[in-house]
Curated annotation (Swiss-Prot):
GO terms for molecular function: pyridoxine 5'-phosphate synthase activity. Pfam families: PdxJ (PF03740). The active site is at H51 (proton acceptor), E78 (proton acceptor), H199 (proton donor). Signal peptide: none annotated. It comes from the Bacteria. Keywords: Cytoplasm, Pyridoxine biosynthesis, Transferase. PANTHER family: PYRIDOXINE 5'-PHOSPHATE SYNTHASE. The record marks E159 as: Transition state stabilizer. GO terms for biological process: pyridoxine biosynthetic process. It catalyses: 3-amino-2-oxopropyl phosphate + 1-deoxy-D-xylulose 5-phosphate = pyridoxine 5'-phosphate + phosphate + 2 H2O + H(+). This is Pyridoxine 5'-phosphate synthase. Belongs to the PNP synthase family. CDD domains: PNPsynthase (cd00003).
Length: 260
């Protein structure tokens, strides 16, 4: 099944980290995350997201440098709040940098950045990145204090952490987490922020989040890489974008893998 989606309704950022994870598992040069990014653009991705972690467990410095001049859309570079990463970002100058919390022992990002608790450090980082012409996003929980702190430190964009929504064990728990995200979207907009969201979203839980009209962009990676094993990379990207757009427009698309 080939999917086509209208552009401009809601943006899809395709995260290519786990293409690099697959490459690094065998120490080979394939699969190439650069090729994955360019094919994702052709399939309808509105931007490419990649996380340069301090331990370089998937994306490497060379990947970021090689990809930056080749993208036709936007690069959204995720990185920790360290001077090393800020300096790398200011050297490469992606269109967007999303500051995220990072712990070496975690499998994946486990929560939002504590902007309120690290206010001066975050504010200084926002100023450094903005001075290099980079738009700053802060990956935070859907918490009123964190959203207010993000606005106060000068970040124009927030990305709301959807991991607790994605990991909810019961419908009631998921409904509660969804309400928190929806309230966070409203709070972000009241502060004049662009509101994005991401983490843990996949083909059967993305619809309610994508339907929220205040969300500009969703960043999704692992689910697309996993689905591509069966559906093919470009069609996996097309399918995710089509599901998101259908949710925003109030229409329906077949579930992943369902017949047309």
């Amino acid at each position: 099944m080939i999917f086509h989606a209208n552009p401009g309704v809601i943006d899809l950022g395709v995260n290519i980290d786990h293409v690099a994870t697959l490459r690094n598992a065998r120490g080979t040069v394939y699969p190439d995350p650069i090729r994955a990014a360019l094919l994702a653009e052709q399939a309808g991705a509105d931007l490419i997201t990649l996380h340069l972690r301090e331990d370089r467990r998937h994306i490497r410095d060379a990947d970021v440098r090689a990809l930056r001049p080749q993208l036709a859309t936007r690069m959204n570079l995720e990185c920790a709040l360290t001077q090393e990463m800020l300096d790398i970002a200011c050297e490469i100058r992606p269109q967007d940098v999303c500051l995220v919390p990072e712990r070496r022992e975690e499998v994946t990002t486990e929560g939002g950045l504590d902007v309120a608790g690290r206010f001066e450090q975050v504010k200084a980082a926002c100023a450094q990145l903005a001075g290099a012409g980079i738009r700053v996003s802060l990956f935070i929980d859907a918490d009123a204090d964190q959203i207010a702190a993000a606005a106060a430190c000068g970040a124009p964009v927030i990305e709301l952490h959807t991991g607790r929504y994605a990991d909810a064990h019961t419908p009631d728990e998921q409904a509660l987490e969804f309400r928190r995200i929806a309230d966070g979207v409203d709070a972000g907009q009241k502060h004049g922020l662009v509101v994005n969201a991401g983490h843990g979203l996949h083909y059967t839980n993305v619809q309610p989040i994508a339907a929220l009209p205040g969300i500009k962009e969703l960043n999704i990676g692992h689910a697309i890489v996993a689905h591509a094993v069966f559906a093919g990379w470009e069609n996996a990207v097309r399918e995710m974008k089509a599901i998101m757009v259908a949710a925003r427009l109030g229409t329906r698309y077949p579930a992943a893998g369902a017949p047309a």
